[in-house]
């Protein structure tokens, strides 16, 4: 992918696996927010899968298990904003720790829509970098909750979807694959 004049690296070792039910929920979230940007959190597991072609090498499969559509603090057709860190923290704790069925899950992605296109905006890229930094400092909101998240961006018009991760100090595109439940 060429993005803003330079080629974006594709991270082939990381894949997001999305089942049809969650994909449908992403679309509903976008439809309900339109013409504004939709946003939400994706929870699931990260599986380390051995690379059979190369010894001591692994792939990382982000398996989507649950999607939570959120109402942004400020509605806009060009951005989404969630400022209430306590609410965000409570949602993450509830989805990953409180519910006994979710003990193995963690936050694996941040979802939002764009009115047109699936490329990250400059604001998206700044937020990816900030959340990576936020994961490295001491605070009350789960230090590693925002590390290595996949940002999933959906085109609000045609429902195309792309994923991105801030990894090895750069924004990289990840493949999103469909999977059965």
Which residues are covered by each model-predicted region?
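Conserved beta-strand-loop surface patch within small alpha/beta domains used
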Residues: 2-107, 115-181
């Amino acid at each position: 992918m060429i993005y803003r004049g330079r080629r974006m690296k594709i991270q082939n070792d990381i894949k997001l696996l999305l089942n049809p039910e969650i994909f449908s929920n992403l679309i509903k979230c976008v439809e309900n927010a339109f013409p504004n940007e939709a946003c939400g959190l994706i929870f699931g597991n990260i599986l380390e899968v051995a690379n059979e072609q190369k010894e001591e090498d692994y792939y990382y499969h982000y398996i989507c298990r649950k999607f939570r559509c959120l109402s942004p603090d400020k509605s806009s057709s060009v951005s989404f904003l969630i400022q209430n860190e306590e609410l965000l923290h409570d949602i993450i704790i509830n989805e990953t720790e409180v519910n006994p069925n979710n003990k193995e899950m963690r936050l694996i992605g941040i979802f939002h829509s764009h009115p047109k296109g699936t490329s990250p905006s400059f604001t998206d890229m700044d937020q990816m970098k900030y959340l990576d930094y936020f994961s490295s400092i001491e605070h009350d909101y789960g230090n590693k909750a925002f590390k290595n998240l996949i940002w999933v961006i959906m085109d609000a018009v045609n429902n195309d979807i792309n994923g991105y991760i801030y990894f090895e100090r750069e924004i990289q595109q990840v493949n999103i694959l469909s999977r059965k439940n």
